[in-house]
Amino acid sequence: MAILVIAEHNNAALAAATLNTVAAAKAIGGDIHVLVAGQNVAAVAEAAAKVEGVSKVLVADNAAYAHQLPENVAPLIAELGKNYSHVLAPATTNGKNFLPRVAALLDVDQISEIVEVVSPDTFKRPIYAGNAIATVQSSAAVKVITVRTTGFDAVAAEGGSAAVEQVSGPADAGKSAFVGEELAKSDRPELTAAKIVVSGGRGMQNGDNFKILYALADKLGAAVGASRAAVDAGFVPNDMQVGQTGKIVAPQLYIAVGISGAIQHLAGMKDSKVIVAINKDEEAPIFQVADYGLVADLFDAVPELEKAV
């Protein structure tokens, strides 16, 4: 039994989500191969070869794969994937984009966002915004799976010495083109990789008030997130959204400020190791999942906390 893991990367560096996905592959059992598809990805392939538990790295270096356009990447993965028992990818924007197409090309059902491996054909995944866990069994010859990375502890990034093999695949399908992207520059950690996250909700009242969270986050070395209510209100951009329809995080410390705790938000952060809630409404649902709660006006509490840090 061999498992193909699709590497998450930016053509320059291997993303941490790949390490969690390899951990899921190890739980399944079998030889683990990693596919690095992109442009000028030698450094990524080198990093993937060092990952604990990986026995082979497949490298598809082609301009057609540079931006992970699903119309180009999916046929490549499907062509390679038919020789494996499992194809795994992190449940990231890219993974959620191309892997359903891979499943369709292989004529199998996809299993989405697993958080536990029961056996090589049986997996657990959250449903109902994380309020229930479904056990799913697949009889497909090739099991196509996205992995919720917060469900698996990352394997070591060093210690492996996998063989590296060049592969080729279908060229540019010509069905879509990459136009451009705007990258937000920040000295703060990336939201899904941060060990500490400070998030604000509707209680922040406006975007300008997020500056008190930024001040606290900078002292803690934390990333800053937001609830959907704050994003929908235009307080902050949607790349800061934590929740079922945003980013899934599981930091060592999650500080929820002015967040009521709708189930959609809880689905994105309830696996955090320690949850601290600050809200003036003592009946707010967020207190039901918080390890520590402070019933207070956030505009008094957060500046005091920032001064004390």
Swiss-Prot record:
Molecular function GO labels: electron transfer activity; flavin adenine dinucleotide binding
Alphabetical list of Pfam families matching this protein: ETF (PF01012), ETF_alpha (PF00766)
**A GO biological-process term:** fatty acid beta-oxidation using acyl-CoA dehydrogenase
Keyword list (alphabetical) reads: Electron transport, FAD, Flavoprotein, Transport
Needed cofactors, names only, are:
FAD
Sites binding FAD sit at 253-281
UniProt cofactor note:
Binds 1 FAD per dimer.
Which CDD domains does the UniProt record give?
Answer: ETF_alpha (cd01715)
Keyword Flavoprotein attached: yes
Per UniProt, subunit arrangement is: Heterodimer of an alpha and a beta subunit.
The similarity comment for this entry is: Belongs to the ETF alpha-subunit/FixB family.
Function according to Swiss-Prot or TrEMBL: The electron transfer flavoprotein serves as a specific electron acceptor for other dehydrogenases. It transfers the electrons to the main respiratory chain via ETF-ubiquinone oxidoreductase (ETF dehydrogenase).
Q: What is this protein called?
A: Electron transfer flavoprotein subunit alpha
Q: Which organism is it from?
A: Pseudomonas aeruginosa (strain ATCC 15692 / DSM 22644 / CIP 104116 / JCM 14847 / LMG 12228 / 1C / PRS 101 / PAO1)
Give the gene name: etfA
